[in-house]
């Protein structure tokens, strides 16, 4: 069904998607758009975006810096039926809204790469939270951090997207998984209070840490508030979400893939779930994308979800600019 697949960008993400696509669609013809001249066996290589248009792909996967999205999308032909964009969608809400207009075509599936929604352990945690298995949520704590030079030890961190403002780096965009899955679990963000900046000696021109308070909308009229801390400098790699509930506490460990509980009346944590690692999320994400195209259905992570992340980041930036005052998340300008 899909005879031509194009991958734009060939960093770690591009390599992963090419392998996934070749495994799932072995009979397809593949094109990789990259400045690299070699090292991609059995695949056509293009160095110019104009060659993408001439290739006429059925599916296009956009990896690389978020700042390059619009230039690539302008070259995608109308007959393309599936577009996958690595997260984040864009570098700002204004740019994201403009991009969404270009992408929003009938009979085309567009999915954004928030793969942690496909984590077995996070799905279990979300189910328990939403089913109130430990009672109503009283508070949320989220903590994510890793020493930036250790992300990709085979390359100089100073040249990475994460380290450069012009490419869409910094914790707000690079760790935007948190803004996506926290809303997926707890609901839309109503308001934020935020500070972010550079606290370490890392040789980067972006924020390396952010401390954000988020208020989530609730149908029951009870506001759920989360404290979120992100950074690029901690050596003990961490990704956790803790839900403090009326009848105990639930904790998700995204590094280990575990869910643990501390029920009321007990004195220790109990193991609830031991999920598979993050690698399985990429394959599940790709399968869901292909299935959405084949069935002409909505993808698991829609263009609107990518925009919602940018709305939260926009509010965070505005709050920081105004000395951490409370800022409502602006949902005007919806185009989807």
Predicted regions mapped to residue ranges:
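C-terminal glycine/acidic-rich active-site capping loop/insertion
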Residues: 115, 240-308, 325-328, 335-336
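C-terminal helix-rich "cap/oligomerization" subdomain common to oxidoreductases
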Residues: 30, 59-62, 131, 217, ...
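N-terminal Rossmann-like dinucleotide-binding module
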Residues: 1-42, 55
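Predominantly a Rossmann-like dinucleotide-binding segment in NAD(P)-dependent oxidoreductases
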Residues: 119-203, 323
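Contiguous beta-strand/loop segments that form the cofactor/metal-binding neighborhood of enzyme cores
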Residues: 173-174, 179-258, 287-295, 334-336
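Active-site regions of enzymes building and remodeling cell-envelope glycoconjugates
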Residues: 41-52, 81
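A short helix->loop->beta-strand "cap" motif at the edges of active sites that frequently abuts
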Residues: 26-28, 79-81, 106-108, 221-224
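Beta-strand-loop-alpha-helix segment that lines the small-molecule cofactor/substrate pocket
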Residues: 59, 65, 70-117
């Amino acid at each position: 069904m899909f005879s031509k697949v194009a991958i734009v960008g060939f960093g770690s993400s591009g390599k992963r998607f090419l392998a996934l696509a070749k495994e799932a669609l072995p009979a397809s013809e593949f094109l990789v758009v990259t400045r690299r001249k070699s090292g991609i066996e059995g695949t056509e290589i293009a160095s110019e975006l104009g060659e993408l248009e001439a290739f006429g792909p059925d599916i296009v996967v956009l990896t690389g810096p978020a700042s390059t999205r619009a230039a690539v999308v302008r070259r995608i032909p109308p007959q393309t039926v599936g577009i996958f964009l690595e997260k984040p969608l864009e570098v700002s809400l204004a740019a994201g809204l403009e991009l969404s207009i270009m992408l929003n075509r009938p009979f085309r599936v567009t999915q954004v790469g928030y793969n942690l929604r496909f984590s077995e352990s996070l799905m279990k945690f979300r189910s328990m939270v939403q089913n109130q298995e430990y009672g109503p949520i009283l508070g949320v704590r989220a903590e994510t951090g890793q020493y930036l030079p250790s992300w990709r030890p085979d390359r100089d961190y100073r040249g990475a997207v994460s380290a450069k403002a012009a490419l869409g780096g910094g914790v707000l965009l690079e760790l935007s998984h948190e803004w996506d899955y926290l809303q997926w679990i707890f609901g839309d963000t109503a308001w934020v209070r935020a500070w972010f900046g550079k606290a370490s000696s890392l040789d980067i021109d972006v924020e390396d840490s952010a401390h954000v308070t988020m208020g989530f909308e609730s149908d029951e009229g009870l506001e759920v508030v989360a404290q979120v801390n992100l950074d690029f400098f901690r050596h003990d790699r961490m990704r956790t979400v803790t839900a403090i509930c009326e009848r105990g506490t639930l904790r998700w460990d995204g590094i280990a893939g575990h869910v643990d509980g501390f029920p009321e009346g007990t004195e220790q944590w109990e193991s609830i779930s031991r999920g598979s690692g993050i690698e399985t999320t990429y394959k599940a994400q790709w399968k869901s994308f292909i299935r959405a195209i084949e069935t002409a259905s909505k993808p698991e992570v829609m263009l609107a979800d990518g925009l919602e992340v940018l709305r939260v980041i926009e509010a965070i930036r505005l709050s920081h600019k105004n000395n951490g005052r409370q800022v409502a998340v602006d949902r005007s300008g919806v185009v989807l």
